[in-house]
């Protein structure tokens, strides 16, 4: 039987896996104990229970003033695996109508944003909206799975817990759709490791085909309006539709990007923003990708130190040679995939995906050690299971649209790398930053699907302008592979916010059972009490 951790899902943003044609998210955030180290005195920002009324845009009155009809959630489950959870009567669901294009709110084209709610059990402050990241992850699924934890830590007493599926994702309508299940399976077998002109051309042809399929099956008009800035506007409509005067929000990983965008667009409507696993809005695609690859190499190196100290480590006994030993095991998969017991084969791409999934939390290091050992013996079962979780593929071979939404949203969130020289620079620097991911055949300077996207981006790297924003809190983990620690430091400065530094090896830390981080985060969300300057938590070792 697989370890319990391997049967859980969460969603976070990640950069391209090597030898793939498109960027991919990955995640498996888990819980850990923590200890608290505090420096300085608490600053109280007040309770904020009686905020001033928000001023809603008059041209959007039909959306801001809509009356929601809540009902059972069974039909909102984004995957078959979620069906039982969504059937729980403690949850109710609805869809909020928003304009497809906020520049043309009266043209009759709308989208339906799915919401899942667990009502507050005590003296209610308002709603706590939450997003787990991606982009492309289901916020309704996230809140449904976190509700039992949040119900016992004080949040469920004071807030309606509300998850939402950002436009194009999960149970929201219309959904982004690019690939069939069979096409998804086929894509995962492909490896683009040939740096020659012919190899680059093949990779780019695959990227172009993906962009064409997304356009044909979703529509360019939808793809043009799924960016972060659009979702931030949806969030304000949601706030008003549930009856809240101010926004209380917890965003994780890419969810911090949503929170930042909301802060820029509606600073006057913010009550509290908790942003954990920060995306730095000033970074370019190349810089953020390279830094994230460096973060994963650090996570691999930390894993290797642990593995080489244990008996039976497939990487040997010397952490200094662990990357080379890992490459020796993995690189043969480029030409000869490993067998999987269900009849599929584990490609080099899927193997790297499974490894990245396991690097998100140190609790998965024993499983990763076992998975690498299996591959060394021609067995791809465990790493394939990890890759399936990453791709949200169930046992019947059905996929959610998370990864397709990830690509589609990413392509409108930042300018594409349209020049071959830019693609080669990215591939070269990413290889250098994360040698454990390298094919050993040289960087493949192929442009990804965004270079062939049918619509232009709606955002670009910038320094956020947040005049009038109330105090916010940013959480950043020192050993976070997907959203490196420094990005949290930088975002806290950009938003004039408070930082909670967490020492540990995992992606995000708050509201997941970590006593130290949770104490600070919950006190902020409930009482608006800011953490002391220099607040620091240390996760207990796994």
Predicted regions and their residues:
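Catalytic-loop region of hydrolases
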Residues: 2-9, 13, 19-30, 42-192, ...
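Alpha/beta-hydrolase fold active-site neighborhood
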Residues: 61-62, 323-469, 513, 519
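Short beta-strand/loop motif that positions the catalytic acidic residue
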Residues: 468, 473-476
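Conserved alpha/beta-hydrolase "acid-adjacent" motif
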Residues: 481-486
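A catalytic-pocket lid/entrance helix-loop region that shapes and gates access to the active site
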Residues: 177-191, 263-325, 370-395
């Amino acid at each position: 039987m697989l370890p319990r951790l391997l049967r859980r899902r969460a969603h976070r943003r990640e950069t391209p896996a090597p030898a793939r044609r498109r960027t991919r998210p990955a995640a498996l955030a888990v819980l850990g104990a923590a200890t608290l180290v505090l420096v300085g005195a608490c600053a109280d920002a007040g309770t904020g229970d009686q905020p001033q009324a928000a001023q809603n845009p008059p041209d959007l009155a039909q959306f801001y003033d809509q009356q929601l009809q809540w009902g059972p959630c069974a039909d909102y489950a984004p995957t078959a695996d979620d069906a039982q959870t969504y059937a729980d009567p403690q949850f109710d669901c609805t869809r909020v109508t928003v304009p497809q294009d906020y520049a043309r709110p009266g043209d009759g084209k709308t989208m339906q944003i799915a919401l899942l709610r667990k009502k507050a059990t005590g003296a209610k402050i308002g709603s706590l909206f939450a997003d787990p990241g991606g982009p492309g992850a289901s916020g309704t699924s996230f809140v449904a799975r976190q509700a039992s934890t949040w119900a016992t830590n004080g949040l469920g007493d004071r807030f309606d817990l509300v998850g939402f599926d950002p436009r194009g994702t999960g149970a929201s309508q219309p959904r982004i759709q690019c690939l069939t299940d069979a096409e998804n399976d086929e894509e995962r077998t492909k490896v683009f490791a040939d740096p020659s002109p012919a190899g680059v051309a093949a990779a780019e042809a695959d990227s172009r085909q993906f962009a064409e399929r997304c356009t044909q099956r979703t529509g360019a008009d939808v793809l043009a309006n799924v960016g972060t800035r659009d979702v931030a506007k949806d969030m304000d409509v949601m706030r008003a539709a549930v009856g809240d005067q101010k926004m209380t929000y917890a965003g994780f990983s890419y969810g911090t990007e949503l929170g930042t965008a909301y802060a820029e667009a509606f600073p006057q409507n913010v009550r509290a923003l908790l942003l954990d696993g920060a995306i730095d809005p000033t970074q370019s695609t190349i810089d953020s990708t390279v830094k994230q690859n460096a973060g994963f190499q650090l996570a691999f190196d930390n894993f290797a130190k642990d593995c080489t100290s244990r008996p039976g480590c497939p990487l040997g006994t010397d952490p200094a040679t662990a990357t080379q030993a890992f490459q020796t095991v993995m690189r043969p998969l480029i030409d000869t995939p490993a067998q999987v017991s269900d009849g599929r084969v584990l490609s080099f791409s899927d193997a790297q995906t499974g490894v990245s999934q396991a690097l998100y939390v140190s609790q998965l290091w024993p499983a990763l050690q076992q998975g690498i050992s299996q591959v060394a013996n021609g067995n791809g079962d465990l790493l394939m299971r990890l890759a399936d979780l990453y791709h949200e593929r169930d046992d019947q071979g059905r996929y959610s649209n998370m990864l397709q939404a990830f690509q589609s949203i990413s392509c409108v969130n930042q300018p594409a790398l349209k020049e071959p020289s830019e693609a080669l620079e990215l591939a070269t620097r990413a290889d250098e930053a994360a040698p454990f991911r390298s094919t050993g055949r040289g960087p493949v300077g192929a442009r990804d699907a965004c270079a062939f996207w049918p619509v232009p981006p709606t955002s670009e790297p910038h320094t956020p302008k947040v005049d009038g924003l109330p105090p916010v809190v940013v959480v950043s983990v020192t050993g976070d592979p997907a959203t490196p620690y420094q990005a949290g430091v930088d975002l806290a400065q950009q938003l004039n916010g408070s930082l909670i530094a967490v020492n540990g090896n995992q992606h995000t830390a708050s509201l997941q059972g970590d006593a130290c981080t949770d104490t600070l985060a919950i006190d902020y969300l409930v009482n608006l009490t800011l953490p002391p300057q220099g607040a620091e938590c240390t996760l207990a070792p796994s």
